[in-house]
């Protein structure tokens, strides 16, 4: 790791501004999955042990950036944080302004303060407003720590602009260090072979960069979900009313051509579950891709033979990376394909198995397989960008390591 890490700082009796990623799923005021909060705890505990005053900042959801919206308040996070820390955690009513400055002034060494949602202000996401917003945030701390791996592919103020105000004093947190070192070592530098990547999700265009990068790394590329139908249509298959990105068809053909040149095996679904609508009670059937999907039906999950083929390849692999569900996992029975992939990864302890955050991580959690996977990343988009480029904007601006 060529960036400064939190262990290289001297934060005793100092204020440390920590960017965390507490963008957790919330329903009716309750957090459904707190893995992102749990993942940040090692850094928070480390700083508290060093008698630092810890100032946490995060975003949650997609508020309009026009001020406080109760729906997106970080208040539900406070209860979970307090449970892990065993003491009261004040929530500043805002992240900037007089109330925030007062809250920061009152925080003492060995305690934690959580600032309210960064995205309540346009300064977090809009570059033209970054300077003033970042200047105020950076005034709160003596040191800056980025532990928000899942957000570090975005050039937002708290991730990209703020650390530049801390020359020699901005560092990666323990979660960030773990993510970069695991993904870098096992997927980029020296993956054990055979190396298989599984990509799902809807759009080819949004993942074309990482797909082309993976074609230089992997032995097998398994494609499913909406993306899979775009590739199938590019091969002239009848996909009925399935989700297809028409503008991605040429990209798919390019990928298929490059894969052939590089001797990478691309594997697409050979059968799929189809129905007239994506609802739990809908009547569904399985059809083979060679047979073709009728025009009034859409593919919603991979079929039984595809599951068997995918799992056969996974079982024969030494490194597996999975990003994106292979079906509409939110709606049973179209979750069966994704659940089968999760269980297949879990029963392969001798392999390095990496789940690239986002929906795939949610599937693994639903399947109860998280503990059996080598690494579940806290960042979907961030893990893809790191695999594509080998770096993230939010880490490039951190101070160089002194070691």
Curated annotation (Swiss-Prot):
GO MF entries: ADP binding; ATP binding; phosphoglycerate kinase activity
Q: Which InterPro entries match?
A: Phosphoglycerate_kinase, Phosphoglycerate_kinase_CS, Phosphoglycerate_kinase_N, Phosphoglycerate_kinase_sf
| Reactions that this protein is recorded to catalyse | (2R)-3-phosphoglycerate + ATP = (2R)-3-phospho-glyceroyl phosphate + ADP
Keywords tagged on the record: ATP-binding, Cytoplasm, Glycolysis, Kinase, Nucleotide-binding, Transferase
* Location(s), subcellular: Cytoplasm
Q: What is its main location?
A: cytoplasm
Where ATP binds, per the record, is at 207, 299, 330, 357-360
Q: Which GO terms describe its cellular component?
A: cytosol
Annotated S-S bridges? none
What Gene3D superfamilies does the annotation carry? Phosphoglycerate kinase, N-terminal domain
Q: Assembly state and interactors?
A: Monomer.
Q: Which family does the entry's similarity section mention?
A: Belongs to the phosphoglycerate kinase family.
HAMAP family annotated for this entry?
Phosphoglyc_kinase (MF_00145)
Recorded protein name is Phosphoglycerate kinase
């Amino acid at each position: 790791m060529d960036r400064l890490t939190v262990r290289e700082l001297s934060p005793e009796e100092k204020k440390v501004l920590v960017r965390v990623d507490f963008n957790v799923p919330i329903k009716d005021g309750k957090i459904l999955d707190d893995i992102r909060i749990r993942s940040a705890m090692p850094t928070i505990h480390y700083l508290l042990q060093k008698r630092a005053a810890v100032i946490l900042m995060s975003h949650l959801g997609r508020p309009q950036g026009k001020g406080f919206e109760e729906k997106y308040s970080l208040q539900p996070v406070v209860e979970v944080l307090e449970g892990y820390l065993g003491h009261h955690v004040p929530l500043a009513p805002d992240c900037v302004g007089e109330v925030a400055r007062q809250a920061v002034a009152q925080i003492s060494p060995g305690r934690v303060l959580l600032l309210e949602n960064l995205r309540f202000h346009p300064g977090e996401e809009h570059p033209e407003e970054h300077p003033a917003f970042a200047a105020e945030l950076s005034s709160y701390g003596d040191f800056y720590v980025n532990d928000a791996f899942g957000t570090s592919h975005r050039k937002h103020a708290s991730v990209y602009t703020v650390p530049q105000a801390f020359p020699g004093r901005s560092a990666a947190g323990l979660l960030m260090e773990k993510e970069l070192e695991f993904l870098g070592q096992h997927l980029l530098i020296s993956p054990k072979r055979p190396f298989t990547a599984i990509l799902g999700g809807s759009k080819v265009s949004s993942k074309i960069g990482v797909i082309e990068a993976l074609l230089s790394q992997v032995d097998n590329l398994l494609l499913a979900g909406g993306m899979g139908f775009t590739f199938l249509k590019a091969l002239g298959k009848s996909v009925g009313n399935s989700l297809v990105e028409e503008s991605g068809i040429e990209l798919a053909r390019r990928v298929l051509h490059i894969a052939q040149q590089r001797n990478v095996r691309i594997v697409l679904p050979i059968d799929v579950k189809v129905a007239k609508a994506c609802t739990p009670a809908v009547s569904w059937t399985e059809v083979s891709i060679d047979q073709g999907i009728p025009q009034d039906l859409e593919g919603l999950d991979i079929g039984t033979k595809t599951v068997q083929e995918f799992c056969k390849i996974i079982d024969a692999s030494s490194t597996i990376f999975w990003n994106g569900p292979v079906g509409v996992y939110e709606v049973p029975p179209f979750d069966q394909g994704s659940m089968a992939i999760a269980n297949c990864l879990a029963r392969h302890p001798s392999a390095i198995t990496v789940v690239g955050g986002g929906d795939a991580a949610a599937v693994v959690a639903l399947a109860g397989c998280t503990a059996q996977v080598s690494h579940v990343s806290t960042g979907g988009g961030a893990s893809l960008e790191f695999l594509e480029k080998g770096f993230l904007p939010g880490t490039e601006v951190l101070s160089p390591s002194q070691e």
